[in-house]
Amino acid sequence: MKKSISILAILGFCGACISFYIGAGFATMQEVVQYEASYGSLFIVAIIVAAIIYVYTNLSFATNGNRLNLKRGGDIYGIYCGVFGQKFGNLAAKFFDYFSALFCYMSFVVMCGGANSTASQQWGLPIGVGAILLTILVISTVIFGLDGILNTLSKIGPIIIIMILFVSIITAITGLPSLSSNMASVDAGNYTNVMKQVGNGNPIASGASYGGFVILWFAAFLAEIGAKNKLKDVNIGMLLSTFFIFGAASICCIALIGHVDVTAASDIPALELAKQISPIVAQIFAIVICAGIYTSAVPLLWTGVRKISHEGTKEYKLITIVAGILGCIIACFIPYKGLVNVLYGLNGYLGFILIFFMIVYDIKTKMSSK
């Protein structure tokens, strides 16, 4: 008898993956600029590389989490790294486990920075207000644990991607007359002084770095979701999210390059695109950006806190509050654009190292099962 699939569950997992992926960097389009659009005509190369990494790694996380019935998502690192011997595996796994938790927490700080920049650029609010409001909402959600997080993310994700597509499709069309000349200008390096770029001019390295930093976001999250739910539903939902995420990224690149004269130097390029449509759309989209920041900030803080405390305990709640407040304070003193470039770029390359362990483990497991 065939195992049935649940359409609602698939859409829920798809929405959760979209929500987790589309945080401050994507919703503001700052990471799209740095990883993809800054490569001009070669942006599609970076997108394809990142998409391949996204699909393979997330299938592996969910499948192995389910197969091994992992109780804690972070244990997935020990599984992959143990393929090179117990002693080395334990050391490498411990490094990735703690480092990924720290990276997820620092990515939460990036989200706070994104909230600050959005609130300041669109509404003229003082630096700190956006981060404080975000932190209050995130702490309140994380305290409810993984089930509460999934419930929240699955509902908000589709709304965010629809609004991003709405703005990017319209501005991609209005920017078409300038696309060719702007693309040539970006290719010629005329915007290198204002457009930060990951990969040092290599779109393959940029795509690898982009896929790499997302690995460290999704590893524990999807391994635990895979362990607790029907694997087929999780994997189909994740694959569906790939189409929406990277399809949206491609359209965003066309829109950003088509209007590169106003987007290149902006902290929040997405707002500049929305303003090309109308001020009202910009106001609405600023709220959507905040929602995107929130949906990524929640599981990022959860992953960091979950590493050092058990969900539901008093200690877990206290650490959630303290870590949230500390991240908010840090974000108020470090520029947002610099946070995205340095933190995401460096950790992307480290995440890519994990892929090597994953490939070796998955091949070995596949061969031993024959």
Residue ranges and their predicted role:
Residues 7-27, 46, 100-104, 108, ...:
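Hydrophobic, membrane-embedded alpha-helices of multi-pass small-molecule transporters
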Residues 7-8, 34-62, 235-250, 343-356:
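Extracellular loop-to-transmembrane helix junctions
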Residues 24, 101, 127, 138, ...:
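Hydrophobic alpha-helical segments and their helix-loop junctions in multi-pass secondary transporters
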Residues 34, 113-122, 135-157, 227-230, ...:
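Membrane-water interface regions at transmembrane-helix termini and the short interhelical loops
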Residues 46-60, 108, 159-171, 211-214, ...:
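Selective recognition of specific alpha-helical transmembrane segments in multi-pass small-molecule
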Residues 60-81, 87-124, 283-311, 335-345, ...:
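Hydrophobic transmembrane alpha-helices that form the core helical bundles
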